UniProtKB/Swiss-Prot annotation:
Residue positions of the active site: 54 (proton acceptor)
UniProt keyword annotation of S-adenosyl-L-methionine present: no
Coiled coil: none
Lineage: Eukaryota, Metazoa, Chordata, Craniata, Vertebrata
Catalytic activity entry: L-seryl-[protein] + GDP-beta-L-fucose = 3-O-(alpha-L-fucosyl)-L-seryl-[protein] + GDP + H(+); L-threonyl-[protein] + GDP-beta-L-fucose = 3-O-(alpha-L-fucosyl)-L-threonyl-[protein] + GDP + H(+)
Gene3D superfamilies from the UniProt entry: 3.40.50.11340, 3.40.50.11350
UniProt site positions, description: Essential for catalytic activity: 396
Single GO term (MF): peptide-O-fucosyltransferase activity
GO BP, one annotated term: protein O-linked fucosylation
Protein name: GDP-fucose protein O-fucosyltransferase 2
Domain of life of the native organism: Eukaryota
Gene: POFUT2
InterPro entries noted in UniProt: GDP-Fuc_O-FucTrfase, OFUT2-like
Keyword annotations from UniProtKB, A to Z: Carbohydrate metabolism, Disulfide bond, Endoplasmic reticulum, Fucose metabolism, Glycoprotein, Glycosyltransferase, Golgi apparatus, Signal, Transferase
The protein's Enzyme Commission number: 2.4.1.221
Biological source species: Pan troglodytes (Chimpanzee)
Amino acid sequence: MATLSFVFLLLGAVSWPPASASGQEFWPGQSAADILSGAASRRRYLLYDVNPPEGFNLRRDVYIRIASLLKTLLKTEEWVLVLPPWGRLYHWQSPDIHQVRIPWSEFFDLPSLNKNIPVIEYEQFIAESGGPFIDQVYVLQSYAEGWKEGTWEEKVDERPCIDQLLYSQDKHEYYRGWFWGYEETRGLNVSCLSVQGSASIVAPLLLRNTSARSVMLDRAENLLHDHYGGKEYWDTRRSMVFARHLREVGDEFRSRHLNSTDDADGIPFQEDWTKMKVKLGSALGGPYLGVHLRRKDFIWGHRQDVPSLEGAVRKIRSLMKTHRLDKVFVATDAVRKEYEELKKLLPEMVRFEPTWEELELYKDGGVAIIDQWICAHARFFIGTSVSTFSFRIHEEREILGLDPKTTYNRFCGDQEKACEQPTHWKITY
């Protein structure tokens, strides 16, 4: 198998044409329709998926990495990102709720995403491309030899697959796999790429070494961020505006149970994220404490930095007293027994508890977003160590303009000696 190696230093020397094939740059705030009008017949499709055990909030982070890759591709050719349908996530455990093949529009505002990069839903891809076929699937993997000490280099090589493929050929020699729950989807070719580096490292390969019109990158979490914490990162993160119907549910809950509205809380939210540039600390937040208390697998997976329920309640009461707050909103994945114990210890706590009909409508992912939206508007927030759920709340509060001192806080383990608080990643416009 031919080796296709692109070292980071070489990638930096590549001279990309300054404009897309249509003669236009794609920039934040531009409509996808502006650049892609009439281009469906010639544009190429980028698809991706993530390791099945990874959760909702890590997958949102992978989207940001893939968006960087798409921006690199757009400098040379017309590409569009096909949004991977949601479903079959470990943390989505509500029984009797159909939670596969969920389009992104259930959770996010697609026009907002399209102001950053051109995106379409998977079913639109099927309609445009002529059927449920993906020309080339690349399974991303690490290097078998690992990273050796010395100078870090970014590279990508076509290599033999290290692990057994989760794809199998049918009698027509098409590849069958999970494909987001779409059983009719088939891959025409599957091969493995060893990658070490940021997402854009695979751009030369996609542009020069395959003519496939539709390309899927499986195990995309193996790619790193191009510019973590930079303007491009924040442009993409800001574009990930929650779906309006979920925000409205959260806003109604804030108003009814927490005496919180954007006007009263000094939060200047705008529907168009490209026009929303807020000075940090200018927003006050609602008159309540926001809490994310991760339990379940974190109890045994992160024993040192996750408190007991009693320890968590002591910290909550201390914060409420310090900040003169008499309301507390808690987002938690605690099992029923633990939740009942928490309620006894903290009877004044408020929680968003959907009815079965609401759960069926919003699904577990929508409920998680509502929880995050409410926590993001709190006067003061405290989260759980190394939880991506808490990380996403940090980012949302940064976008809304709340004081970082009220955002980057976490619970400490009961016996934890050095309780390092989360790093402040300042928003960049």
